[in-house]
Amino acid sequence: MTACWIAVTNAGGAAGFPFPPVDVGHVAPVVDALADRLDPDRSRILVARIGGSLAGWVVLRRDASPLIAHWGVVNHLQTQLTYRNEGIGSALMRRLREVARDDMRLEQLHLAVRGGMGLEAFYSRLGWRVTGRWPGKLRLAPDDTRDEVLMILAPL
């Protein structure tokens, strides 16, 4: 997962590290922290493999608070660069929806994407809808400020 995340980030992907380049020293501790928080009821990592190799992965989390325990948050969807445009991301998101609904008993999913990357269109094709945006929230460089776009998938 670490190698995938490094490659995706350094290729300009919006997967959690906004300031490339990154290396193992940046990414490995974050992957370790994700793994440490895994819990069947609250946090899962779904992976896609092709021929035994990691093709992509995504994180699904549920908050511990009973107030919002009915919805999940999706983070870090990414595919290996060699498997781009082969439907891996879409397949991961379809499977994530099933896991959220059938295994974790979630009722809705939320995510936030970086504006200006075409991600809204990708998620919209999978049934997600935009619920709002934080204009100018993400400052990637002095001359590159983007909206953070909030999306929901409901019902599952």
Q: Where does each model-flagged region fall?
A:
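Conserved beta-strand-loop-alpha-helix junction that forms the acyl-donor binding cleft
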Residues: 84, 109-120, 137-142
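Conserved GNAT acetyl-CoA-binding A-motif
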Residues: 93, 100-113
